[in-house]
């Protein structure tokens, strides 16, 4: 092959590779924009402060749940070590680890009133986490307090049980196969992988049930796996930074553990929240929904599409889940939830059993003008200025035309009826 042709072939091949990777780079930029809009860096700092108050109560509750089951009694010490290695890495200072263990041991001797106060502090952290996750998933309205309590109780009890059960199974496997004696290197690799899997289980539980929004199970699992791997990489990078680069010991002396611990908790929350943003954005990957802009006129079209789908399902006597709606409306689940919430506020739709949605009004009773005012433009009657009056005059003919068309008429025009 002539050199010129070889050079042209190389350029073409490189261009093809760049074109193939373009969706991944574009999706990464999309996630970065979402993190910036959600102020993940600032929220991580806020959660770091809240964690300082609630870390010991959460740690104590987790140990109390584990110790309540005799089958886990032999593994309580290992459970402590595993939790502390995640929450307080060894490079953050042995002083904090010793204090954490002392706090947890002393907390087990508390009276009923003291335990209640510990629970309240832990619930405060859970409430802050829920509000943060709801903001990431675009939830405007939280759960009722009774439903909130059920979610918090599930996380505070099921999380430690999942960790304890997984740890019990893991240690049984090691004991049955004698990996630690026969293949120590493989045992170390499997133990590191087991830590990632255990962390992913808890994160998947958080990502799946804490947001007041439908989160597909596979999205929660993928997001949790990616986040747990990032946590391990962050732990390694942070250890290198503290050991080789930073000079906290030189500046702070005996108090060096405190800023190191604060910085680690901040990094921990930063990775967890970044994983939550990644999990919420996974629904935008399907159908290249991340490429579109969620502008008012697009939400107007999405609302029409949702109503048409629910009208057709109503005629069949069915209800549609968010997953079924998402197959036709190419948006993220958070954006779809926002459209459904606005329609529900006006009484057009309602969520029924199992997150399924139904149409509450006849399609012939819903005109396009009302939907236009909900999602695109509504005149502010209290303004009374010249600009508002002029806009109302210009939009008058359009409003009249939309007023004459119902969702049922639209369905006939587009061949849905």
Curated annotation (Swiss-Prot):
Origin: domain of life? Bacteria
The UniProt entry lists the main location of this chain as membrane
GO annotations of cellular component type: plasma membrane
Location of the protein in the cell: Cell inner membrane
- Give membrane topology per the record: Multi-pass membrane protein
Q: Which PANTHER family match?
A: INNER MEMBRANE PROTEIN YHJD, UPF0761 MEMBRANE PROTEIN YIHY
Protein name in UniProt: UPF0761 membrane protein CV_0810
What is the organism of origin for this protein? Chromobacterium violaceum (strain ATCC 12472 / DSM 30191 / JCM 1249 / CCUG 213 / NBRC 12614 / NCIMB 9131 / NCTC 9757 / MK)
């Amino acid at each position: 092959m002539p050199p010129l042709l070889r050079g042209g072939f190389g350029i073409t091949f490189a261009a093809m590779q760049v074109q193939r990777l373009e969706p991944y780079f574009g999706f990464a930029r999309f996630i970065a924009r979402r993190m910036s809009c959600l102020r993940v860096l600032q929220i991580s700092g806020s959660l770091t402060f809240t964690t300082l108050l609630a870390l010991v109560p959460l740690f104590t509750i987790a140990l109390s749940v584990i110790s309540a089951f005799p089958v886990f009694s032999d593994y309580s010490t290992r459970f402590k070590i595993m939790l502390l290695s995640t929450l307080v890495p060894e490079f953050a200072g042995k002083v904090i680890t010793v204090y954490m263990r002392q706090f947890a041991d002393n907390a087990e001797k508390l009276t009923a009133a003291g335990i209640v106060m510990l629970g309240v502090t832990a619930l405060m952290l859970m409430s802050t986490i829920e509000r943060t996750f709801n903001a990431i998933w675009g939830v405007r309205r939280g759960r009722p307090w009774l439903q909130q309590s059920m979610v918090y109780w599930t996380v505070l009890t099921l999380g430690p049980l999942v960790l304890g059960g997984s740890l019990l199974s893991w240690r049984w496997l090691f004991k049955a196969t004698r990996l630690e004696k026969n293949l120590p290197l493989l045992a170390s690799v499997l133990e590191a992988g087991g830590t990632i899997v255990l962390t992913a289980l808890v994160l998947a539980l958080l990502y799946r049930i804490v947001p007041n929004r439908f989160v597909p199970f596979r999205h929660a699992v993928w997001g949790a796996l990616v986040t747990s791997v990032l946590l391990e990489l962050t732990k390694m990078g942070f250890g290198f930074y503290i050991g080789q680069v930073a000079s906290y010991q030189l500046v702070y002396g005996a108090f060096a553990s405190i800023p190191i611990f604060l910085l680690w908790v901040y990094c921990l929350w930063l990775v967890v929240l970044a994983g939550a943003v990644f999990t919420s954005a996974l629904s935008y990957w399907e159908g290249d929904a991340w490429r579109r802009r969620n502008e008012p006129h697009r939400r107007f079209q999405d609302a029409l599409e949702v109503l048409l789908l629910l009208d057709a399902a109503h005629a069949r006597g069915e209800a549609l889940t968010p997953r079924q709606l998402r197959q036709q409306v190419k948006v993220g689940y958070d954006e779809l939830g926002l459209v459904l919430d606005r329609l529900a506020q006006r009484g057009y739709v309602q969520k029924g059993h199992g997150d399924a949605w139904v149409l509450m009004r006849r399609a012939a009773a819903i005109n396009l003008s009302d939907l236009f005012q909900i999602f695109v433009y509504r005149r502010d009657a209290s303004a009374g200025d010249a600009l508002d009056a002029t806009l109302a005059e210009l939009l008058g003919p359009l409003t009249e035309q939309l007023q004459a068309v119902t969702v049922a008429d639209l369905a006939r025009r587009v061949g849905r009826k």
